[in-house]
Amino acid sequence: MAPRAGQPGLQGLLLVAAALSQPAAPCPFQCYCFGGPKLLLRCASGAELRQPPRDVPPDARNLTIVGANLTVLRAAAFAGGDGDGDQAAGVRLPLLSALRLTHNHIEVVEDGAFDGLPSLAALDLSHNPLRALGGGAFRGLPALRSLQLNHALVRGGPALLAALDAALAPLAELRLLGLAGNALSRLPPAALRLARLEQLDVRLNALAGLDPDELRALERDGGLPGPRLLLADNPLRCGCAARPLLAWLRNATERVPDSRRLRCAAPRALLDRPLLDLDGARLRCADSGADARGEEAEAAGPELEASYVFFGLVLALIGLIFLMVLYLNRRGIQRWMRNLREACRDQMEGYHYRYEQDADPRRAPAPAAPAGSRATSPGSGL
């Protein structure tokens, strides 16, 4: 009976050994597999890879393609769609949760490019020169939580930003959105409408500030916390238009982790000044027709006042040193003043003596005799 009792355990061990002995799915051509194909695939094959590999195992969880020349992501590109854009039936990668497509020269993402990836939670399209983005490019991604588009929207212009608004609209479950390094001059309205967004990365853009409408859109109804905002390395203009942003930052510092790195790019008088160190009441508006000189006349903060105080202290110190020098040399100064007084007195006495000599009538010269008086003088013999 004992051997019979041990048979189930032995059978279980045999089943596990058989499962482990089965050959794993082969790694796709031009790709590297780490920990088995279903864990991580990395495909970095240069310009010869012009479309996603077709032989990715269906149980793959993570797929990375770097350095390829994909150029155009057509509809259902990862679900068996062919080069003509025809979609394949069904889902080829039902378990894929992370897809990284950085540095692949992708210029166009068509509608439905990621169809057939129902489990995809993280998508990274950073560092691709996108020029066109379909309004339905991200449709069919109900589980998407993270979307990275860093350094990918610079070349597209306003049309691409408008398409981005349409493409973001269906991503109701999105938590993280990366838009760093895209020369954005405003926040995408669709990004502000994502109800579950937890973090918005807009660093290294061209944001001169956030207007009151954008700040209101960052707040949630019902007291729910709004998304964190990464805002560093933007050319902020610290004029009167920055007052709402400054007030918002001081009330929600924890929502802007890099708030201490926010610095002014204009006006010139406040160049590289930390925004949080400014006094909102002192931020002035430049005249609409003012030039650079008008900009320099804007907002003088506490540091400028401190410089004036320091200058006054330096002048006071110089005056104190001057008084100390006078005090230490008081005897020499008194001697110099006495000598000067005596010299002046001697000079005045000399002037007075000469004046008296000139005024004495006895010392006046005799008047000259007339010319005709010599003929009748007593000794003339006439």
From Swiss-Prot:
Pfam families: LRR_8 (PF13855)
Extracellular topological domain residue ranges: 27-307
Membrane-topology descriptor: Single-pass type I membrane protein
Positions annotated with a glycan in the UniProt record: N62
Transmembrane residue ranges: 308-328
Biased composition (Low complexity): 365-382
Start-end of each LRR repeat: 57-80, 93-116, 117-140, 171-194, 196-217
Protein name: Trophoblast glycoprotein-like
Gene: TPBGL
